Amino acid sequence: MTAIRKNDMNYTLDDFTKLEKIGEGTYGVVYKGRNRRTQAMVAMKKIRLESEDEGVPSTAVREISLLKELQHPNVVGLEAVIMQENRLYLIFEFLSYDLKRYMDTLSKEEYLPSETLKSYTFQILQAMCFCHQRRVIHRDLKPQNLLVDEKGAIKLADFGLARAIGIPIRVYTHEVVTLWYRAPEILMGAQRYSMGVDMWSIGCIFAEMATKKPLFQGDSEIDELFRIFRILGTPTELEWNGVESLPDYKATFPKWRENFLRDKFYDKKSGNYLMDEDAFSLLEGLLIYDPALRISSKKALHHPYFNDIDTSKLPAGNYRGELQLE
């Protein structure tokens, strides 16, 4: 058994008590647990690997261990990485609510308050900027791996796991991994992708926080692409240099020409839009087709939408991507 140290404390599985199963994530079963040394609650993720017989690739263990260095108030802390009998357990700090569950608690008539929408989006961008500056891409961001607490903080979970372990097509329960937040370059088979994939996901989540409805609800890769095209128009080389060279681009794609994005935010009942001009301008920057032109997390933190945000109570304060000497 190997345990990888955090704060010089060598943890083994015996240091944690499993309390109850709380879900099945992309990578396996998640349990609520207790750290026997500190009595703190933890989330224990038992990673299911495709090749159970061979055990855990050492590259995955090394890669995941590096994630313990990602210490930021808006990133769910990885407290220990434990290998036992060819099983890999990741021990994270425990938060009881994810963004999806939180939004599901809002009544039919109720929307996320505009200050909360702004605060959550800013905090997500702060975490993303911190990780991107350290060359860590999330690649599988969705409301289910954004965790919230009662103090108004939001934290990103599962950072870097996509690269370390790979994203399975189906979850543990054979439920298909959601495509609703996946960037068009990934959907069209790009072999190399950049931090822009996360910015696209943030755009989709930002829109969903405003309307309570997923923006692009596809049930297959091609359905997902066509739903994007129907709202934003089918991309051409003109707005996305290199799109026609992507492996899964087809010249026969239907040519939707109009952009209907703004219509998605019109609330018939009140006659108002669910996003103001600044918010919509940020969203447009996040949903630019060409990943090279899509807004970066650092630029997004300086967008006029956030000019009036009160950062005094935020976990990471007014951090807007300034590099800190560590």
From Swiss-Prot:
Regulation: Phosphorylation both activates and inactivates the enzyme depending on the site of phosphorylation.
UniProt GO MF annotations: ATP binding; cyclin-dependent protein serine/threonine kinase activity; protein kinase binding; protein serine kinase activity; RNA polymerase II CTD heptapeptide repeat kinase activity
InterPro entries reported in the protein's UniProt record: CDK, Kinase-like_dom_sf, Prot_kinase_dom, Protein_kinase_ATP_BS, Ser/Thr_kinase_AS
GO biological process: cell division; G2/M transition of mitotic cell cycle; mitotic G2 DNA damage checkpoint signaling; positive regulation of meiotic cell cycle
Keyword terms of this UniProt record: ATP-binding, Cell cycle, Cell division, Cytoplasm, Cytoskeleton, Kinase, Mitosis, Nucleotide-binding, Nucleus, Phosphoprotein, Serine/threonine-protein kinase, Transferase
One Pfam family cited in the UniProt record for this chain: Pkinase
Domain Protein kinase: 16-306
Residues engaged in binding ATP: 22-30, 45
Entry annotation: catalytic residues: 140
Gene3D superfamilies: Phosphorylase Kinase, domain 1, Transferase(Phosphotransferase) domain 1
Major subcellular site: nucleus
Signal peptide per UniProt: none
Oligomeric form and interacting partners: Forms a stable but non-covalent complex with a regulatory subunit and with a cyclin. Interacts with cks-1.
Family statement drawn from the similarity comment of this UniProt entry: Belongs to the protein kinase superfamily. CMGC Ser/Thr protein kinase family. CDC2/CDKX subfamily.
Protein name: Cyclin-dependent kinase 1
Organism of this sequence: Caenorhabditis briggsae
Phylogenetic classification of the source organism: Eukaryota, Metazoa, Ecdysozoa, Nematoda, Chromadorea
